[in-house]
A protein has these predicted regions:
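A compositional/biophysical signature of low hydrophobicity enriched in polar/charged and small residues
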Residues: 1-78
Length: 78
């Protein structure tokens, strides 16, 4: 059984032209299992799988420090 019990989707709006760079940066982060550039309201959607909500909070806090990210939303699976 996997120890990564918390699954979340992180959406971000980024500065124009930085979509691919930010998505690549996210994909290299620990516990980010997928990072996609999308069309529509959100520029990037990333899937995060981690051990607990405290670790998820730390990951989201670290992601939000990326200067090209201007707006975010996170959905946590039940």
């Amino acid at each position: 059984m996997s120890s990564k019990t918390v699954k979340a989707y992180f959406m971000a709006i980024v500065k124009q032209g930085s979509e691919h760079e930010v998505a690549q940066r996210l994909s290299k982060m620990e516990d980010v299992t997928e990072s996609l550039v999308t069309y529509g309201l959100w520029d990037i959607v990333a899937r995060i799988e981690t051990e607990n909500l405290q670790k998820l909070d730390m990951i989201i806090t670290e992601i939000r420090k990326i200067t090209d990210i201007t707006q975010t939303s996170t959905l946590v699976g039940a």
